[in-house]
């Protein structure tokens, strides 16, 4: 997709997507809009069954809300967050999915269990629990606990509103991993198959070599983003994470929504994959980074292939 020069600010669009024309976005491109707002009024203004994919990472439970000192505990999730997810269920198309990236923090001597409670709460709301993906971090930050190892995984739970959720694994194929013996055998095969004798003596059969590209697993091995971060956001997931789910669960031109958008990583992935997007972030300190991230284009896009 051609990108505008870094000096050219993408124009503001009106009425995209349908249903929020009366709300002025803080920033927009030909594909999407950013709103600096609480996410509830944006969700309420959207028409029902208008979203193809919702992907988000809400604040971790019990942790300060980054710079403002507010804590997002279990009560916050039971009240505000569940109101958000109730609206998301209404706004999803019948084939749409909701992907929730979440990891409970440790509390004293035990791990929090809110991530598992959320699965049950969402099922009670009417969601179908489709899949759980694990985001594995090869180089996690060092731990600060005497009796625990480095925290190297987070969960991405996929939910839908009907059993007919769309799914495009062919967009996410990964190179097959063959051992040395398999690779040597593949080099000897003519036309990618060979004929071998049946053990029963009933003739011959063809044995086809395995494919070069295969479906990926539910283990997503991605480096986290930490350390030097010009946006000062403490929990920005890598752009490869939303990119994977956008490829897997949507087609070009469909609409992606993130109600807790942060610095706009979901928007950057959607923009470069040709999907329409709507991002909401209440903290302008974080959302201000999005125009530069969109304009950076290849520098960002190269990190999610």
Regions found by a protein language model. Give the residues of each.
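Core catalytic lobe of class I
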Residues: 1-289
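Cysteine-dependent PTP/DSP-like catalytic domain, specifically the C-terminal lobe
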Residues: 285-305
């Amino acid at each position: 997709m051609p990108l505008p020069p870094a000096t050219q600010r993408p124009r503001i669009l009106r009425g995209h997507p349908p249903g929020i024309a009366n709300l002025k976005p803080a920033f927009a491109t030909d594909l999407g809009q950013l709103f600096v707002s609480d996410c509830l009024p944006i969700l309420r203004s959207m028409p029902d069954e208008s979203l193809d994919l919702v992907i988000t990472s809400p604040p971790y439970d019990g942790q300060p809300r980054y710079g403002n000192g507010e804590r997002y505990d279990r009560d916050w999730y039971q009240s505000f967050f569940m109101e958000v997810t109730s609206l998301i269920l209404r706004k999803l198309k019948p084939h749409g999915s909701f992907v929730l990236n979440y990891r409970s923090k440790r509390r004293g001597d035990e791990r929090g269990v809110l991530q598992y409670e959320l699965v049950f709460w969402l099922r009670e709301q009417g969601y179908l629990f489709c899949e759980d993906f694990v985001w594995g971090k090869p180089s996690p930050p060092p731990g600060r606990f005497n009796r625990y190892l480095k925290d190297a995984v987070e969960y991405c739970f996929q939910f839908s509103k009907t059993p007919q959720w769309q799914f495009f694994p062919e967009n996410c194929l990964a190179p097959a991993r063959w051992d040395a013996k398999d690779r040597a055998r593949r080099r000897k095969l003519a036309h990618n198959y060979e004929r071998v004798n049946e053990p029963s003596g009933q003739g011959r059969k063809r044995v086809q070599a395995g494919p070069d590209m295969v479906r990926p697993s539910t283990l997503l091995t991605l480096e986290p983003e930490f350390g030097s971060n010009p946006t000062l956001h403490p929990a920005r997931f890598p752009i490869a994470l939303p990119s994977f789910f956008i490829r897997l669960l949507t087609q070009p031109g469909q609409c992606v929504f993130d109600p807790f958008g942060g610095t706009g990583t979901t928007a950057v992935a959607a923009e470069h994959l040709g999907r329409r997007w709507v991002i909401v972030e209440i903290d302008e300190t974080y959302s201000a980074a999005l125009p530069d991230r969109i304009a950076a284009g290849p520098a960002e896009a190269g990190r999610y292939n």
